[in-house]
């Protein structure tokens, strides 16, 4: 006689909210290098939104601000 365990519900991970939406959320600005550097990996690449939980619209704004800051020399393209 074999016993089967009751089917378990899959682990549910709560979706994180976007850090740029809300009443007192920071504004995305290309001059704010401290804020932008939190969304760049240790290799200098832009971290995807599925990791940072940034909404699609704000991720596009963030990527544009990072690219502007790189072009102006405020952020490096590659970190060695």
UniProtKB/Swiss-Prot annotation:
One of its GO terms (biological process) is translation. One of its GO terms (cellular component) is cytosolic small ribosomal subunit. SUPFAM superfamilies: Ribosomal protein S18. One of its GO terms (molecular function) is structural constituent of ribosome. It comes from the Bacteria. Pfam families: Ribosomal_S18 (PF01084). The keyword RNA-binding applies. Keywords: Ribonucleoprotein, Ribosomal protein, RNA-binding, rRNA-binding. Transmembrane segments: none annotated. InterPro entries: Ribosomal_bS18 (IPR001648), Ribosomal_bS18_CS (IPR018275), Ribosomal_bS18_sf (IPR036870). Part of the 30S ribosomal subunit. Forms a tight heterodimer with protein bS6. Belongs to the bacterial ribosomal protein bS18 family. HAMAP family: Ribosomal_bS18 (MF_00270). Binds as a heterodimer with protein bS6 to the central domain of the 16S rRNA, where it helps stabilize the platform of the 30S subunit. This is Small ribosomal subunit protein bS18. It comes from Methylocella silvestris (strain DSM 15510 / CIP 108128 / LMG 27833 / NCIMB 13906 / BL2). The gene is rpsR.
